[in-house]
Design a protein with these regions (language model features):
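Flexible, glycine-/basic-rich loop-and-beta segments that form/coincide
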Residues: 197-245
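Class I S-adenosyl-L-methionine
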Residues: 1-61
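Conserved SAM-binding strand-loop segment of SAM-dependent methyltransferases
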Residues: 88-98
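Conserved SAM-binding loop
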Residues: 80-81
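A short acidic, Gly/Pro-enriched loop at the edge of an enzyme's catalytic core
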Residues: 100-111
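Mobile active-site "lid"/loop adjacent to the S-adenosyl-L-methionine
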Residues: 114-143
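Conserved Class I SAM-dependent methyltransferase catalytic core
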Residues: 136-191
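Conserved SAM-binding motif I beta-strand of class I
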Residues: 66-71
Length: 245
């Protein structure tokens, strides 16, 4: 699968096309296993790109996932269709801007490796509480808000975001106080990034009044997956945190 995907991306010849590293998918898969213990759940990716995140998640997990993939890029949508058909994986593929209204049911889990940079549609960004007061709005903040919009009452957003986004602009602080819970911030290993400005974190978000996760924020840095003992300890700490709710 990875070979076919990389070959297809090379043929599309667009330098902006990239895939979510498999190790990040592994981390998210383990988090979902801790949360849902292989229950049947609905999972949507709102920035699915090549579909790599979803397909690796389905392959790595023992759970039964009802998958929905959303991406604005036509080439990515066609690529996903071909690869998911080849792998005989049932996925609903929606080819549209994920920050526009979506005709999908509320989800148990929403994942996204959210895009860097700014959202080009200033008019649509005005529909979001996390839009910028002036100029273009950050993609990451809008994706966080949109994920919250489509979670069911006890759903969990598991989002890979630039860590610098968490330096909390005023409107994000207000959004956290009034609209959602930021339940966990899990910083990815430093070695995965060329410099500090590129560093990412996995965040867990839920709606107010949810009962799925503890409200006390879980803060951690994931050890390298090569450090098996350290990684096992991280998973144990995460499970202990879950038991506190």
């Amino acid at each position: 699968y990875q070979f076919l995907l990389l070959k297809a991306l090379k043929e599309l010849n667009n330098p902006s096309y990239d895939i979510t590293p498999e190790v990040i998918t592994m981390y998210v898969s383990h988090i979902l296993e801790c949360l849902y213990n292989n229950e049947k759940i609905s999972v949507a990716d709102f920035a699915s790109g090549s579909g790599n995140f979803l397909i690796n998640l389905a392959a790595l997990s023992k759970g039964d996932y009802e998958l929905t993939s959303v991406d604005v890029d036509n080439n990515y949508a066609r690529l996903q269709q071909n690869i998911f058909n080849l792998l005989e994986t049932n996925v609903e593929i929606i080819n549209q801007d994920a920050l526009k209204p979506l005709n999908i049911k509320k989800q148990d889990v929403i994942i996204s490796d959210v895009p860097f940079g700014y959202y080009a549609d200033e008019d649509n960004s005005l529909n979001y509480k996390l839009c910028s007061a002036e100029g273009y709005s950050l993609n990451a903040l809008l994706f966080i808000e949109q994920a919250a919009n489509y979670l069911n009452d006890n759903g969990v957003g598991v989002l890979v975001v630039p860590k610098k986004v968490l330096e909390l602009e005023d409107n994000f602080k207000k959004f956290l106080e009034e609209d959602i819970n930021l339940n966990a911030v899990i910083t990815l290993p430093d070695e995965m990034f060329k410099n500090a400005s590129q560093q990412k974190a996995i965040i867990l978000i839920t709606k107010k009044d949810q009962t799925k996760l503890p409200n006390q924020v879980f803060l951690a840095q994931v050890p390298s997956h090569k450090n098996k003992e350290g990684y096992a300890n991280f998973i144990e700490e995460f499970k202990n945190w879950l038991s506190e709710k």
